Amino acid sequence: MKQTLILLFTLIFIGCITGKEIVQVWSTLPDTDQLLINKTIDLKVSPEDVKELVEIFPDQTCQTVLGVGAALTHSSAYVFHQNLNSVRRDSLFRVLFTPEGIGINYTRLCVGASDFSFNLFSYSEKEDFTLRNFSIAEDYKDVIPMLKEIISINPDIQIMASPWSPPGWMKTSGSMIGGKLRPDCYDVYADYLIKYLQAYQQEGIEIHTMTVQNEPEYGTAAYPCMDMTADEQKLFIRDHLGPKLSASGLKTKIVLFDHNCDNPDYPVSIMSDSIAKSYVDGSGFHLYKGEISALCKVKEAHPDKNLYFTEQSGGGWAPDFDQNVRWYVGELLAGAMNCWSKNVLLWNLALDENDGPKNFGCQNCWGVVQVSSNGKVKHNAEYYAISHYGKVVQPNAVRLVSSGEALKGVAFRNPDGSFVYLAVYHGKETKVIRFKCANTMFDYSFKPGEVVSFKWK
């Protein structure tokens, strides 16, 4: 923290005494020893002829973006809570959740058990349509204490919640694994979800958005899951959850789908029902299948509704650190936000040295950070990808239209009036690229594979 403040004041001082306008630059090179290198360049162009141009159009505004982050799963909360003492945890949380660190401003909670919890559990274990014994006791162990610590550091963090499964007694399988929601349980399940939101509200925790079902097209997993067709989700939202949530007085917004980009017709068909659509804020997507352009297709069909990117995990199946940083920034962050997403969420915030604790699900998923049982913290590629966004893009920034084919990138204007461009250069040779934003221009020499975040006024 002290070093960050000294650097900031030094840069301000230098700018004052020289009178130069500067561009703040954060650079990551394929050489993993050069990660998030902070430097400045002059806000001017070189006399040489530069053929490649990226133009940012400050008057062509798109969506307001809320932030990036990852899920505080039960496993993530556990490793934060149990593997770090309070002093080291506070230090890590300030790195993760403040602008002086990597600027995480969005997280996701699991409503009950998921593939990253210790066991199968719900908040109402015995069949009871009155939900008299509803309790979030399991969440008091790790999730709620950790979430409260995070909120104390970043009170404005956005929170999404997603259920993996209703209680087993509400399902045709009689288990949290597999099956469908029983038709006679649509109403009580809506009550169950609202009770969850109310229980968190009583703890002083506002949940801003809630998806209806995590990965509704994957009902055959060995961990908590449920198959839910688009028609079933439409009926559940239109006739049960939507009316009940509206009547509850809660401000939580409903996000439908919450699955892969290979089936944009799922959310499009639900929102084709005007009543169901009236209860919905937008659609959520993962990118384990399909193309990120699916978000653009949904926006074209329903331009009045929002888009969210709700989950993506890295893991042992993609071990190339440098390639992962480039993919996350260029394909996922820039790709999703250029297709109107208001956020980007990765999967686990943290896991231990054994990629867990886990619950019959992914055996080699990685967190944004690894927090080992001995308290050692390791930063994964996801950490650096989030950093390239969070260090420069403020909450409630507005995406701007930009053009140029030399880079994978996305542009923003921050609430303080500064401009941002995130860029991934896939070229194999060093290349100078010129940036133009209204009457402002500057040049930057990209090295092969470089990931860069620019910020200027």
What is the predicted role of each segment?
Residues 1-21:
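Bacterial Sec-dependent N-terminal signal peptides
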Residues 36-207, 239:
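N-terminal catalytic cores of secreted or lumenal carbohydrate-active enzymes
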Residues 306-385, 402:
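Aromatic/acidic polysaccharide-binding cleft in carbohydrate-active enzymes
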Residues 391, 402-438, 449:
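Carbohydrate-binding surface patches
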Residues 188-209, 216-317:
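Active-site neighborhood of glycoside hydrolase catalytic domains
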Residues 445-457:
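C-terminal beta-strand-rich structural cap/linker in extracellular carbohydrate-active enzymes
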Residues 70, 103, 159, 210, ...:
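Conserved, mostly hydrophobic/aromatic
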Residues 370-417:
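Glycan-recognition and catalytic regions of carbohydrate-active enzymes
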